[in-house]
Amino acid sequence: MDTAIILGLLVAVFYGVGTFFAKIVCEKNPLFQWIVVNIVGIILCLIILLKYKNIIITDQKILTYAIISAVLVVIGSLLLYYALYKGKASIVVPLSSIGPAITVALSILFLKETLTLPQMIGIVLIIIGIILLSISN
């Protein structure tokens, strides 16, 4: 099996289990969950920086993209935790899962990536599933 596929599945497992525990915390205080996630992230970043000292990129364009990405991901995680506080994980999480379809669309438009027919069908089925989950509320 392709390494990227294995890593993608691991991401899904880690996000899935992590979001389950986040839902439990968010029922008490979504800001606390967000703060803990960011503190743990900073600690992990420091560990990585100590190990890989030449990881810093000084190219302005790449740095700008990295900052934009970080701001959007941080805001997205805060909104996810607040949504978990306000609603059911069974509704919020599938709705938030449309994010990868947005990434795919942007990658096709701007990075000129292409999809095979099975990939297109898979994305359409995911979107249909998300719609069905959201209207069943």
Curated annotation (Swiss-Prot):
It comes from the Archaea. It is found in: Cell membrane. Its main location: membrane. Coiled coil: none annotated. Residues 13-135 form the EamA domain. The keyword Cytoplasm does not apply. InterPro entries: EamA_dom. Pfam families: EamA. It is a multi-pass membrane protein. Keywords: Cell membrane, Membrane, Transmembrane, Transmembrane helix. SUPFAM superfamilies: Multidrug resistance efflux transporter EmrE. The keyword Transmembrane helix applies. The chain crosses the membrane at residues 4-26, 35-57, 62-84, 89-111, 116-135. PANTHER family: ACYL-MALONYL CONDENSING ENZYME-RELATED, SOLUTE CARRIER FAMILY 35 MEMBER G2-RELATED. This is Uncharacterized protein MJ1333.1. It comes from Methanocaldococcus jannaschii (strain ATCC 43067 / DSM 2661 / JAL-1 / JCM 10045 / NBRC 100440).
